[in-house]
Curated annotation (Swiss-Prot):
GO terms for molecular function: ATP binding; protein kinase activity. GO terms for cellular component: plasma membrane. It is an enzyme of class 2 (transferase). It is found in: Cell inner membrane. Belongs to the ABC1 family. UbiB subfamily. The lineage of its organism: Bacteria, Pseudomonadati, Pseudomonadota, Gammaproteobacteria, Alteromonadales. This is Probable protein kinase UbiB. Pathway: Cofactor biosynthesis; ubiquinone biosynthesis [regulation].
């Protein structure tokens, strides 16, 4: 353990005590050494006793810096784990940090390019356009075509800082599994592992560039989403160069209203955009918070979204997609038994789950939702409540579904912020029903045959040879099986004969012994015993020697 990690660990412990987070651990769960640590830092007092535990956690994470802020933001989306108050407080965390020195930014960019910035760019602006915990963005003009671009570069030494904090988080999470009364329900170790995967993925800007290119290609010519062009030849692990956009932040409703944006159409397109990404492309933007979404300035009566920051993307298996679509349809049909069946069939909960008990639990949670109009029912909260219910039946956590739930909550919140009258069900239902019709029935079968036709056309010339080889193999197997059967029958015949003789000899020996003790004339006894020994010898010699068939 390095001096820096010891110092960081001390700062984390001090912050926990300063905000009174140690009070959240039940007294009977605190280990013997906890009091020693607490007393050795007697001058650190809880100065926030009047604040709620959730607010104290938010303030502590804000104080601990960017890595913990991003963890808090991720936790705020895990409403299947946290109560609403905790999720609300953590959602207020802001990933805003002071920019780092532009000289360091230049040095990092040139190290990735392998050449001075002026070789490829003009008008590089030392003042960053934006600054976050992991990266910083500068503007410039690309020399090759004169177009405005942005350069996203990772902060210096950010990987080492994140790995050090992740190590501390993992150790703390393992301790909390034991100390917290509901540690198993909150699953801190699982949450940190999920966070590790997410944040380490954000450290690879080359991967983000490839994600952006794929998402852009999926929506080329679309009237709902535009993804800026990425200059792949200038993108590396610590640097990404992309087209500069000039949209309006989706959270700036005043500016959108001032330009006459069609909010109803924009909200509906947001819902369609989500379901298209999930069910058509199986590749969805999983970090669609307001800071990553802009709205076009052109044609406000026919607006489209502009998507940035493709560091976190989600995918679902075909099985997950089908069960998810069926889940939503079953919910709106109030078919709770089918919902319970789907969770078990999909493997999201154990096959040994009591389906009747699970169905009743789902009904208790879902039925009250129908007391309000359909246009007020939230897809995200339906999924959230189902996950929360499944927690009590030991749901097998599916990271891809957690990303989906988070994204769906973002999209719904965004849609209703833009257009409060948005009827999510009426917008999504035709999409889900059309997608389901393509997955089952004659049309689905025809599409699958059609999609596999090139494969079978490629294999068709090999069919005669494959058929001939299989016939030869079949004949060979048949001959081998016949030989094994013959050997087995011979073995059985010998075995039966041997057993018969051995049993007969045993009977004769027993009879001879009885006669030997009961009568005066001994020749019958000797005859039985002699015959028994002879028959035993014959039976013993006739035993089958080999059991291999």
């Amino acid at each position: 353990m390095t001096t820096a990690s010891i110092r960081r660990g001390y700062h984390v412990i001090k912050t926990i005590l300063h905000f009174g987070l140690d009070d959240l651990i039940p007294k009977h769960k605190k280990p013997w050494y906890f009091a020693i640590v607490r007393n050795s830092l007697f001058w650190v007092r809880n100065k926030h006793k009047t604040k709620s535990p959730a607010e104290r956690l938010k303030l502590a994470m804000q104080d601990l810096g960017p890595v913990y802020i991003k963890l808090g933001q991720m936790l705020s989306t895990r409403r299947d784990l946290l109560d609403d108050e905790w999720a609300y407080q953590l959602a207020m965390l802001q990933d805003r940090v002071p920019p780092f020195d532009s000289a360091l930014a230049r040095e990092a960019i040139e190290a990735e390019l392998g050449a001075p910035i002026a070789t490829y760019f003009d008008d590089f602006n030392d003042t960053p356009l934006a600054s976050a915990s992991i990266s910083q963005v500068h503007t410039a003009t690309l020399k090759s075509n004169g177009k405005a671009v942005v350069l996203k570069v990772l902060r210096p030494n950010v990987e080492q800082q994140i790995l050090a904090d992740l190590q501390l988080m993992t150790q703390t999470a393992n301790l909390l599994e034991t100390l917290l009364g509901d540690g198993n329900r909150l699953r801190p170790a699982e949450v940190i592992e999920d966070y590790r995967t997410t944040i380490l993925g954000e450290l690879n800007l080359k991967l983000e560039a490839l994600n952006a290119i794929k998402l852009r290609n999926n929506f080329l010519g679309s009237n709902s989403l535009y993804v800026p062009f990425v200059y792949e030849e200038h993108s590396y692990q610590r640097l990404m160069v992309m087209e500069r956009i000039y949209g309006i932040p989706v959270s700036d409703t005043e500016a959108l209203r001032a330009q006459g944006t069609n909010f109803k159409l924009l909200a509906e397109r947001g819902v369609e955009l989500f379901f298209t990404q999930v069910f058509r492309d199986n590749f969805f933007h999983a970090d669609m918070h307001p800071g990553n979404i802009f709205i076009s300035r052109e044609h406000p009566d026919d607006p489209f979204y502009i998507g940035l920051d493709c560091g976190i993307m989600g995918t679902l298996t075909e099985v997950d997609k089908r069960y998810l679509a069926e889940n939503f349809l079953a919910f709106f049909n109030r078919d709770y038994h089918r919902i319970a069946q789907l969770y078990i069939e999909s493997g999201w909960v154990s096959e040994h789950t009591d389906i009747i008990a699970f169905e009743q639990a789902v009904k208790v949670v879902c039925e009250p939702m129908f007391n309000k109009p359909l246009d007020e029912i939230s897809f995200g909260h339906v999924l959230l409540e189902l996950f929360r219910t499944a927690r009590h039946f030991d749901i097998v956590v599916q990271p891809q579904l957690v990303l989906l739930e988070k994204t769906l909550l973002y999209i719904e919140g965004l849609g209703r912020q833009l257009y409060p009258q948005l009827d999510l069900w009426q917008t999504a239902k035709p999409f889900l029903e059309n997608w389901m019709s393509e997955q089952v029935g004659p049309k689905a079968m025809f599409n699958k045959v059609k999609s596999n036709a090139p494969f079978w056309a490629d294999k068709l010339p090999e069919f005669p040879e494959l058929i001939y080889d299989n016939l030869k193999l079949g004949r060979k197997l048949l001959g081998t099986q016949q030989q094994m059967l013959d050997k087995y029958l011979r073995y059985q015949q010998k075995s039966h004969k041997s057993n018969y003789l051995l049993i007969t000899s045993a009977v004769l020996l027993i009879c001879g012994t009885i006669l030997f003790t009961q009568i005066v004339t001994l020749w019958p006894a000797y005859t039985c015993i002699g015959a028994g020994i002879l028959i035993w010898a014959i039976g013993w010699r006739s035993r089958p020697k080999n059991r291999k068939f």
